[in-house]
Every structure is written in C-alpha cells, then in structure tokens.
C-alpha cells in the first residue's frame, strides 16, 4: 500500500490495483502539488461537505468514472450532479473491492455555501477508517478533540492517522497531540494547516509533541509505503 499526502487534507491511497482519493481539494489549494485536470482516481472518499474538502470531486469523478463514497446527504447531493455515489453514515462499515470503509463521528459542521448566499446542509461531518491489505488508515477529517477517539483507538489498530492541526476550525497542535495519544496510531501525520492564514502552523512543532518516531510531517507529494 502506498499513501501520499498532497497538501491541506488531500490523501491518496494506492492499494489492490485502485487509487483512492480522500477530500480532493486541489483547485485553490495553495499547498498542493497536484493539478486537478491530471488527477486519476477510481474512488473518492469524502469526510464532509465543505468546499475545501469536496473540492474538485465532481470534475475528477466524472472524468475518471470514479465512485464517490460519502455520508447519505452529501452522496445524494453529488449524485444529482451526475456522479456515481454510495451513501453511508456514521458507525456503518462497507467492504468494497478496494478495501473497507467505515465512517466515524467528527465534531465540526458540513454544508455548502452557494453563490446566492444559501447554505445547503450536507449531513454530519465524519472521519474515515479505511482498511486494506491488513492495514488501517484513519483520516479524522475536520474535527475538534473528542473523547471517543479513545474508543476508536481501542476498537481499531491504526497504522497511520491523519490529524488536523490548523486550529481555528479544527484541533490545534496540542489537542491533536492528545488525539494521537488516545488513538494509539503507529504513525501520525498532520493535515489541514498552512493553506490559509487562520490555520498557519509549524508541523514540526506538532511532531515534537509526540513520542519519538510517531509523528511525521509529509511534504506535498511525499509518500509512505506500508
């Protein structure tokens, strides 16, 4: 399994002959190394409906005939735009040919702001547990610290956890360090920082809060192999 980070909250997983993208916010992402027009994907997983996470989903999904897996409301909304979707919800797991997807809770919000000043509710925000080849990846999405992260860590052996550290809209570094401890992940990678001024952070400072060897700040385009 190959896992790549592409700035903000964009993660790519290559496994079982498939390419899976999580939260493909590319156009307008000042930290990414990707060009949306060149991105290939078989599957897109979405944590919630904010624009900096849904991003280029519709364009990428249509061009690649990719399946989009998201919460029921978000999946329904995207299906109306001609995208193939599979709707799920928090606590539910589904085994696909590319791996198993399970949605966890997240403490945040989820909605799309339209140009005519309307907000479309798009279900609950989530985290994602993705399991394939005997490895489990946890992408927390956007969230504050919550005590059930302990339960997630108890119920699942997490190989890599992607945790937001930007503060303002999500956990900051200190709370994310507590989350890392509760989750017990073998490797913790910071996400959702430095894209916009309100979420400016030093990822190495976050890494320094973790036990030696647990934290690793990936550069956009950098990969790890499991």
From Swiss-Prot:
Keywords: Hydrolase
Listed Pfam families: Lactamase_B_3
Molecular functions per Gene Ontology: hydrolase activity
Superkingdom of origin organism: Bacteria
SUPFAM superfamilies registered for this protein in UniProt: Metallo-hydrolase/oxidoreductase
Similarity comment text for this entry: Belongs to the UPF0173 family.
HAMAP family membership: UPF0173
Protein name per UniProt: UPF0173 metal-dependent hydrolase GTNG_2675
């Amino acid at each position: 399994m190959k896992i790549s980070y592409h700035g903000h909250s964009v993660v790519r997983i290559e496994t079982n002959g498939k390419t899976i993208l999580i939260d493909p916010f590319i156009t307008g992402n000042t930290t990414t190394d990707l060009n949306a027009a060149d991105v290939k994907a078989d599957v897109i997983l979405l944590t919630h409906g904010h624009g900096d996470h849904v991003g280029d989903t519709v364009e990428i999904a249509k061009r690649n005939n990719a399946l989009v897996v998201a919460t029921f409301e978000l999946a329904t909304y995207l299906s109306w735009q001609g995208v193939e979707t599979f709707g799920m919800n928090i606590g539910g797991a589904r085994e696909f040919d590319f791996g198993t997807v399970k949605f966890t809770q997240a403490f945040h919000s989820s909605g799309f702001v339209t140009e005519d000043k309307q907000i479309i509710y798009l279900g609950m925000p989530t985290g994602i547990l993705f399991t394939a080849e005997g490895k489990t990846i946890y992408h927390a999405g956007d969230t504050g610290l919550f005590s059930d992260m302990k339960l997630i860590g108890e119920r699942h052996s997490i190989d890599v956890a992607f945790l937001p550290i930007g503060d303002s809209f999500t956990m900051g570094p200190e709370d994310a360090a507590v989350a890392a401890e509760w989750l017990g992940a073998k490797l913790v990678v910071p996400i959702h920082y430095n894209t916009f001024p309100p979420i400016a952070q030093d990822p190495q400072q976050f890494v320094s809060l973790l036990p030696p060897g647990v934290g690793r700040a990936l550069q956009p385009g950098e990969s790890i192999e499991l």
